[in-house]
């Protein structure tokens, strides 16, 4: 009888471990659909910015849980708006990219973030800060 209880306890423990591991894996990849959409939008950005914008507008931003995911969305959305001639004059959209990429981004991410920061300053008519952003971008290269 003791052996039988041991086996059932062991089986229950094994099921719980598998359930925990499965939950951990899925919680880490819970935004994989959003990440796929970001990748699709990025691939379309230069040739079909209107399609990239449509994809980005269809992403539920609350599904982006990581700082990198939020920053990537912010930068891609800023690019899509600019490439579709939609001028923005606030940093509401780009700010997550500025906050994340300036410290943690690759050189390309930093450069692109500074460039779109400069574009927003240009749209606001603030040529001095636009030039500073472009100079910061230039210094990264």
Q: Across the structure, where does each feature detected by a protein language model lie?
A:
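A "functional boundary" signal
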Residues: 2-10, 14-141
């Amino acid at each position: 009888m003791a052996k039988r209880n041991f086996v059932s306890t062991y089986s229950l423990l094994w099921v719980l471990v598998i359930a925990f591991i499965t939950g951990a894996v899925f919680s880490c990849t819970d935004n994989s659909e959003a990440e796929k959409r970001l990748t699709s939008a990025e691939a379309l950005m230069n040739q079909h910015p209107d399609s990239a914008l449509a994809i980005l507008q269809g992403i539920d931003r609350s599904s982006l849980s990581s700082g990198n995911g939020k920053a990537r969305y912010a930068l891609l959305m800023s690019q899509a708006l600019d490439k579709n001639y939609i001028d923005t004059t606030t940093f509401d959209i780009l700010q997550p990219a500025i906050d994340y990429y300036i410290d943690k981004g690759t050189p390309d991410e930093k450069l692109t973030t500074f460039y779109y920061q400069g574009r927003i300053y240009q749209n606001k008519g603030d040529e001095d800060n636009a030039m500073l952003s472009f100079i910061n971008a230039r210094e990264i290269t």
